[in-house]
């Protein structure tokens, strides 16, 4: 029984998910259905949390829109997500960046992770 569940989960998992973590800036292309039409909507922001649970993996992206903080949680392997693109790698020392909710301006900046040779 356990093997059947594992096989079904592996079958539904996406293989084109890039490697990213907390502190990275990502652009998530989300499929949005409006009436009969379906279009892609981009959501760009900072990953403040990532949850690795196989098929049930999720991540939370935060952005500032018109001076207001907006957070959106995505299921990593959801069919509504068309693509995830990593724009910038951030250097952080925490797995969850919830403390950024109280910060704004320069204090909410994240250092960039430089590529190692």
From Swiss-Prot:
One of its GO terms (cellular component) is cytosolic large ribosomal subunit. The keyword Ribosomal protein applies. Gene3D superfamilies: 2.30.30.790. Keywords: Ribonucleoprotein, Ribosomal protein. One of its GO terms (biological process) is translation. InterPro entries: Ribosomal_bL19, Ribosomal_bL19_CS, Ribosomal_bL19_sf, Translation_prot_SH3-like_sf. SUPFAM superfamilies: Translation proteins SH3-like domain. One of its GO terms (molecular function) is structural constituent of ribosome. This protein is located at the 30S-50S ribosomal subunit interface and may play a role in the structure and function of the aminoacyl-tRNA binding site. Belongs to the bacterial ribosomal protein bL19 family. This is Large ribosomal subunit protein bL19. The lineage of its organism: Bacteria, Pseudomonadati, Pseudomonadota, Gammaproteobacteria, Alteromonadales.
């Amino acid at each position: 029984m356990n093997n059947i569940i594992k096989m079904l989960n592996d079958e539904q998992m996406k293989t084109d998910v890039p490697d990213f973590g907390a502190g990275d800036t990502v652009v998530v292309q989300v499929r949005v259905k409006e009436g009969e039409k379906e279009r892609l909507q981009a959501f760009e922001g900072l990953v403040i949390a990532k949850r690795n649970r196989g098929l049930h993996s999720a991540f939370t992206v935060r952005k500032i829109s018109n001076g207001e903080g907006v957070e959106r949680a995505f299921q990593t392997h959801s069919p509504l997500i068309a693509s995830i693109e990593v724009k910038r790698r951030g250097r952080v020392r925490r797995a969850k960046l919830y403390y950024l909710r109280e910060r704004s301006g320069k204090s909410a900046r994240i250092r960039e992770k430089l590529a190692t040779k």
